[in-house]
Amino acid sequence: MKKKLIIVVGPTASGKSDLTFKLAQDLKSEIIVCDAYQVYKEISKGINKPEIENLNAIKHHFVNHVSINEVWHIKRFKEEIEELINSNMDKNFILEGGSNLYIDCLINNYQLNELDLTLDYSNLSNDELYEKLQKLDFEESLKISKNNKKRLIQALRIIESNNNTKKSVLDKNNKEPLYDFFLIRMIIDRDILYKKINDRADKMFKNNWREEVEQLIKANGNSMMNTNALKALGYDEIYNSIIENRETNLDLIKQKTRNYAKRQETWIRNKFKIDFNFSNYDQYNELLDKCKAFLNDKK
């Protein structure tokens, strides 16, 4: 019988963390945070890490897990999460989606090769990256916006590390899933979501987000922007504003975050098999019953 795992996914600022925490309390579960940036110890102000009280109340895995100077990538995440789950088969885990690709690689059990981290795309413009992707993998280029530099680089790194199209790499390395999943999708009105994103950005900025980046620059020098940790939304704009001695364009950060949330919703809708759509806490008891039934099903 496969290990059963509950997953909560949804766009940023949709309330995933609150729902995951409440479910973990009621199901006596530990939480696995599947986020590409909460894993880092040195950044916190702009990535909505769990509150200290929550971290103390329930075990959260992969939060404050590595230093920004360490190599961290999706392959290492998959290896470590499988080791964690397989060595604790008696425990319940709820996975909180932050980076949908992390969730996708676990659900589909992708066998990932080491990515060539020496491949450097930092000097290429978005247009140059997109043109390169079109030449190497035209089908993949149709799925990615020319403005989404992070995903363009991510796709190119997979393609060039494996000398094959992204689809061929994933198809070749896709094996039978190791676990059974119950996937919960957060549903939230677009206007409400965008207001939450804007309000959260204001709160983060008032909570010394810019000062955090200033301290990172002092501690690590200007080369810090080459670390994966500082590719988190908003950090590049804050970094550039400090280096250029200007005010941070918080409206730009809000706009990029809203665009990111929209892309997340599209990904979730198109890629994942949803078991429960959660839109308000009137549904909570129904959801909890379904989660218990899933965990207790011995099939």
From Swiss-Prot:
UniProt keyword DNA repair, yes or no: no
Binding-site residues, ATP: G10, P11, T12, A13, S14, G15, K16, S17
Cofactor(s), by name: Mg(2+)
Recorded GO MF terms: ATP binding; tRNA dimethylallyltransferase activity
Site features described as Interaction with substrate tRNA, chain residue numbers: S99
Enzyme class (EC, first level): transferase
InterPro entries: Dimethylallyltransferase, IPT, P-loop_NTPase
Record's keyword terms, sorted: ATP-binding, Magnesium, Nucleotide-binding, Transferase, tRNA processing
EC code: 2.5.1.75
Positions that bind substrate: T12, A13, S14, G15, K16, S17
Gene Ontology biological process terms, A to Z: tRNA modification
Catalytic activity reported: adenosine(37) in tRNA + dimethylallyl diphosphate = N(6)-dimethylallyladenosine(37) in tRNA + diphosphate
Entry's family note: Belongs to the IPP transferase family.
Function field: Catalyzes the transfer of a dimethylallyl group onto the adenine at position 37 in tRNAs that read codons beginning with uridine, leading to the formation of N6-(dimethylallyl)adenosine (i(6)A).
Assembly and binders: Monomer.
Protein name: tRNA dimethylallyltransferase
